[in-house]
A protein has these predicted regions:
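Active-site and adjacent substrate-binding regions of carbohydrate-active enzymes
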Residues: 1-143
Length: 143
């Protein structure tokens, strides 16, 4: 998400040749954008129908690519401040899903699908949760 691996390069070779980070150049603004994009993926993962899958490191925004760079050691300690913020936000999303019958069992009802916006409802037993994904601003809302 942060551009550490270019679309036109061999991602497998890149993983062998250098360490893949969140961004290629360590630019703080690009890194923040990458974390926001990754968070949108977690929001989608935790609000669409089905069983969410949080894979090794997803909960704190672990960077990676294809083999051999897709299996970093799991961090249980020593997270950066931004990784800890990301982890806390994912924990809040998981807790919200656990406490929301519409997000667990609800029917998926698309409301708006556009180039940079996706709005859908999850409805169960008269209760509705609305999820808005805003790609243009890398933002979301869950009501």
């Amino acid at each position: 998400a942060g551009g550490a691996v270019r679309w036109d390069e061999n991602d497998k070779a890149a993983g062998w040749e250098r360490e893949i980070g969140v961004t290629a150049d360590g630019d703080a603004a690009k890194e923040e954008q990458a974390y926001k994009a990754a968070m949108l993926l977690e929001v989608i993962n935790l609000t669409i129908p089905g069983v969410p899958c949080i894979y090794q490191g997803d909960e704190y925004g672990e960077a990676g690519a294809n083999d051999p760079d897709n299996r970093h050691m799991m961090k249980f300690n020593g997270l950066t401040e931004r990784q800890q913020q990301f982890r806390n936000e994912v924990q809040q999303l998981v807790q919200m899903r656990r406490n929301s019958l519409p997000l667990i069992y609800g029917e998926y009802i698309p409301v708006e699908v556009a180039d940079n916006k996706w709005v859908f409802d999850r409805t169960y037993m008269g209760e509705t949760v609305r999820v808005t994904i805003d790609l243009a601003n890398l933002a979301y809302s869950i009501n």
